[in-house]
A protein has these predicted regions:
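Membrane topogenic helices and adjacent juxtamembrane segments
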Residues: 1-36
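Helix-loop-helix units of permease transmembrane domains in multi-pass membrane transporters
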Residues: 4, 63-89
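Selective transmembrane-helix segments that form parts of the transport pathway or gating/packing helices
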Residues: 11-22, 82-104
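Aromatic-anchored segments of alpha-helical transmembrane domains
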Residues: 23-28, 92-96, 170-183
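Secretory targeting signals
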Residues: 28-49, 90-159
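Long, hydrophobic alpha-helical segments
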Residues: 44-64
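Hydrophobic/aromatic residues in alpha-helical transmembrane segments
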Residues: 59, 63-66, 148-151, 216-220
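Terminal transmembrane helical anchor/hairpin motif
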Residues: 101-137, 158-234
């Protein structure tokens, strides 16, 4: 099987430039709050929420954009499945590394200005200098969201409207993974508390990520292994 250098490289470059732009925006927001308001928590802790939706979008794009391209250029569905799995396995820690840098830069800014840095909810880490735990937490998070995106997208690609049925297990994957890293908050725009009551620990997080990766991509493979190539409607 060929290493997905182009697939992975393209997504990494886009993510890098998107992160640089996002870093500038969040830094300006942080300075604005610190100067004209009251800053007593980490801004990046809140900003992370958008990055996981970005990961979901990348997972969706892996199927909607790259699967037809691979098949049209003579590669098998098995080759695509392998390259997508490798891409997720490397892209998730890459995104996590960008967040590690973000927290370190935020810590430096807070230290220079005398602002108070604190977390608003439970995490695997308690300080911005706990690099290994920050890296682990967000790698686990990105694995869950990337896998959920690939799974849902494959279902919609194959069954179109029938792909709605895949949303429930995809949400379950995300909630399961998030629960092991301390994020037991409800889904956006839902007032009920939905999730799993799991222990917050490095071991639980790793096991959850591995489980989500294997189960989610296994189900994805069952969907795409003989999926027909769809023509895009212009």
């Amino acid at each position: 099987m060929r290493f997905p250098s182009r697939l992975l490289g393209a997504n990494m470059w886009v993510a890098l430039f998107a992160w640089l732009a996002y870093l500038v925006v969040i830094t300006l927001v942080t300075v604005g709050i610190g100067v004209w308001g009251e800053l007593n928590e980490s801004v990046w802790e809140k900003a992370v929420q958008l990055t996981r939706w970005y990961a979901l979008f990348v997972g969706v794009a892996l199927v909607t954009e790259f699967l037809p391209l691979f098949i049209a250029h003579g590669q098998s569905r098995r080759q695509f499945g392998f390259q997508a799995a490798v891409t997720i396995a490397i892209f998730a820690p890459f995104l996590s590394a960008l967040l590690v840098i973000s927290f370190l830069l935020e810590s430096l800014l807070y230290g220079l200005t005398g602002w108070t840095w604190a977390l608003g909810q439970a995490h695997l880490f308690s300080a911005p200098t706990q690099v290994p735990m920050i890296f682990l937490e967000y790698t686990v998070m990105f694995v869950g969201w990337l896998v959920a995106g690939v799974f849902v997208s494959s279902a919609f690609y194959r069954w179109q409207g029938g792909g709605l049925l895949a949303i429930v297990p995809a949400v379950a994957i995300v909630l399961f993974v998030q629960a092991t890293i301390g994020d037991k908050a409800p889904l956006p725009f839902i007032s009920l508390r939905i999730g799993f009551d799991l222990a917050d620990s490095a071991l639980s997080a790793v096991l959850a990520a591995v489980g989500a990766f294997v189960v989610g991509l296994g189900l994805t493979w069952l969907i795409i292994r003989d999926v027909p190539l769809r023509n895009k409607v212009s």
